[in-house]
């Protein structure tokens, strides 16, 4: 397996990171995950635009142009012969010696890019059957719009969900539902798609954006606004979404069944529309439902 370290492809076991890299010591960096179908990137520009936007919000300069970055990632994908899978990439602020919370102003650090690509098939069964989630207080910082390497709050919530055999932890600040530990959450109520506004309390998911676009295109009303735990529990349908899980229905919340416990009709339609977008961009999907 080859991985990318700056502009070099190296064997996974030969890849190294400096112990005083600020990403390693502080989580000082940003990242993205881009999906591949039939060897082609899906919503690539949207992901990379968000990467550069996240970097700008923390005054981090990515040492490659968008064109240079794409060429590097395409080489990575080709070298590993990825058909359906994920590309994880991150950029840290670079190495600072000695370690210091304060970013140096006397010389610019050179950002460090790393990336890896892996074959990850679509989970058709999960897209149809869905699964349970739990709710958990959102204890993360207040700039969740930045796709930062600082993920400890997400990790703790996701691990708690895993320990309870749940797909996800739905995060909430008091009564206000925000998102999940590694995905966005949406509800359907009276035929309306309802999801949290794209503000500082959530990451504006790329899959979330595609879902909103296809909903509007196909006449499904969309409401981007706060909703509560009560709204969540009284919803007609609930689903989670992300680059890696596409649109996955929620069957139970904290052990309580959602409606009839099956994927709802609007959720199914939205996933159909979403798959159509993938097919248009990347070609036909084997076993797509």
Swiss-Prot record:
Q: Which residues carry this modification: N6-(pyridoxal phosphate)lysine?
A: 147
EC number(s) per entry: 2.6.1.21
What's a single GO CC term here?
Answer: cytosol
According to its UniProt record, what is one Pfam family this protein matches? Aminotran_4
Q: Where does substrate bind?
A: 31, 99, 101
Q: Which residues bind pyridoxal 5'-phosphate?
A: 50, 179
Residues of the active site are 147
Q: Which InterPro entries match?
A: Aminotrans_IV, Aminotransferase-like, BCAT-like_C, BCAT-like_N, Class-IV_PLP-Dep_Aminotrnsfr, D_amino_transT
Q: Which UniProt keywords apply?
A: Aminotransferase, Pyridoxal phosphate, Transferase
The molecular function GO annotations come to:
D-alanine-2-oxoglutarate aminotransferase activity; pyridoxal phosphate binding
Listed under catalytic activity are:
D-alanine + 2-oxoglutarate = D-glutamate + pyruvate
Name one process (GO BP) from the record.
carboxylic acid biosynthetic process
What does the record give as cofactor?
Answer: pyridoxal 5'-phosphate
The entry sums up its family as follows:
Belongs to the class-IV pyridoxal-phosphate-dependent aminotransferase family.
Q: How does it assemble?
A: Homodimer.
Functional note: Acts on the D-isomers of alanine, leucine, aspartate, glutamate, aminobutyrate, norvaline and asparagine. The enzyme transfers an amino group from a substrate D-amino acid to the pyridoxal phosphate cofactor to form pyridoxamine and an alpha-keto acid in the first half-reaction. The second half-reaction is the reverse of the first, transferring the amino group from the pyridoxamine to a second alpha-keto acid to form the product D-amino acid via a ping-pong mechanism. This is an important process in the formation of D-alanine and D-glutamate, which are essential bacterial cell wall components.
The protein, known as: D-alanine aminotransferase
* Species of the source: Listeria monocytogenes serotype 4b (strain F2365)
């Amino acid at each position: 397996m080859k991985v990318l370290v700056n502009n070099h492809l190296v064997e996974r076991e030969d890849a190294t990171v400096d112990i005083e890299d600020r990403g390693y010591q502080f989580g000082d960096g940003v990242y993205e995950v881009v999906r591949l179908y039939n060897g082609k990137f899906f919503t690539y520009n949207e992901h990379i635009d968000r990467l550069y936007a996240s970097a700008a919000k923390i005054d981090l300069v990515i040492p490659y142009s968008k064109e240079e970055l794409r060429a590097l990632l395409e080489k990575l994908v080709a070298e590993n012969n990825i058909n359906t899978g994920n590309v994880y990439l991150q950029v840290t602020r670079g190495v600072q010696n000695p370690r210091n919370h304060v970013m140096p102003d006397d010389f610019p650090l050179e950002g460090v890019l790393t990336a890896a690509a892996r074959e990850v098939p679509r989970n058709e069964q999960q897209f149809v059957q869905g699964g349970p989630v739990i709710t958990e207080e959102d204890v993360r910082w207040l700039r969740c719009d930045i796709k930062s390497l600082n993920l400890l709050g997400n990790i703790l919530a996701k691990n708690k969900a895993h320990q309870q055999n749940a797909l996800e932890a739905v995060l909430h600040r008091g009564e206000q539902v925000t998102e999940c530990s590694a995905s966005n959450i949406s509800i359907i109520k009276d035929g309306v798609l309802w999801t949290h506004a794209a503000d500082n309390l959530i990451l504006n998911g790329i899959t979330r954006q595609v879902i909103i676009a296809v909903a509007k295109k196909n006449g499904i009303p969309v409401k981007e606004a706060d909703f509560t735990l009560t709204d969540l529990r009284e919803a007609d349908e609930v689903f989670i979404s992300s680059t890696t899980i596409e649109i996955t229905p929620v069957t139970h919340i904290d052990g309580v069944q959602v409606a009839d416990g099956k994927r709802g009709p609007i959720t199914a339609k939205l996933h159909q529309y979403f798959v159509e977008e993938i097919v248009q961009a990347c070609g036909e999907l084997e076993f797509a439902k």
